[in-house]
Amino acid sequence: MAIMVDPPNGMGNQGKYYYSMWQTLFEIDTKYVPIKPIGRGAYGIVCSSINRETNEKVAIKKIHNVFDNRVDALRTLRELKLLRHLRHENVIALKDIMMPVHRRSFKDVYLVYELMDTDLHQIIKSPQGLSNDHCQYFLFQLLRGLKYLHSAEILHRDLKPGNLLVNANCDLKICDFGLARTNSSKGQFMTEYVVTRWYRAPELLLCCDNYGTSIDVWSVGCIFAELLGRKPIFPGTECLNQLKLIVNVLGTMSESDLEFIDNPKARRYIKSLPYTPGVPLASMYPHAHPLAIDLLQKMLIFDPTKRISVTEALEHPYMSPLYDPSANPPAQVPIDLDIDENISADMIREMMWHEMLHYHPEVVAAMSAR
């Protein structure tokens, strides 16, 4: 539970209350009443809370010492810039970023999201039964949210069950945009680490430089297979093992299936693997609907140029009971996520401050009145 505590050194800041959760100090705006901690990760701690002004339940994520690690700081800044623009019922909503007291020296960031009950990883590993309707509805919502992102030229690049939040109504929302980039970006971001290995597309495993939205579709296919089978389809131990597991299921590739590989060494490796006929997905998931298997096969195609797109997946017969094209408008404008990777920590801090101002017009008004 959240325990109210005295401020550090007995010196509290106006407009802030202090709470201890899991031996971590939270300095949060007085309008929020924390309930209990609900999650912990490398980034920090998440607690559930109530907004006194609206009576709405929210999730507060504290990112501790965000500037200690430059990569984490840039990830956080990108997520703030992106979520300010995104408005879709299958994408998590960032409702507030708490203003720190000291503009030039703050170390922690407090993000306020809509509150969800669990995530798809927890559901998959639970004993709770999942019907065809459950699997279909989760996949539909994931594809809807992803179609919206792709319409804004955004690649998520880290889709996995743990990044898909779910509530008691089975509503699903995509979260964690720290690795997201614009599809138009070129250069160094294309070769850096992306996507948790088990959900990583072949073109990433093979170090192809020019990838696009199809990497997210592969991840969706892996997630859908995990929903159907209640375990990861390709639980590789390292990169080469990951490729072997994929080929063992899909079967040995034809010459035309390898044309997209622009790395000669990578192409030689795939060709060196022993011949395998593959394993029919219908035999791996014998209880799945035949149309579900057909769609899964189209998402898990080795060659990204032949893989189904998000829009095509939504138009697949398996989705026809749920999909209404007129109810899925695209994002309004493409979003610019390009940030100079070499900017100083002070500049990242200043850019975060300006992102916070979008949620606090009262601070902007006070600054203008000076």
UniProtKB/Swiss-Prot annotation:
Residues 32-319 form the Protein kinase domain. The modification Phosphotyrosine is found at Y193. Keywords: ATP-binding, Kinase, Nucleotide-binding, Phosphoprotein, Serine/threonine-protein kinase, Transferase. It catalyses: L-seryl-[protein] + ATP = O-phospho-L-seryl-[protein] + ADP + H(+); L-threonyl-[protein] + ATP = O-phospho-L-threonyl-[protein] + ADP + H(+). Activated by threonine and tyrosine phosphorylation. Belongs to the protein kinase superfamily. CMGC Ser/Thr protein kinase family. MAP kinase subfamily. This is Mitogen-activated protein kinase 3. It comes from Oryza sativa subsp. japonica.
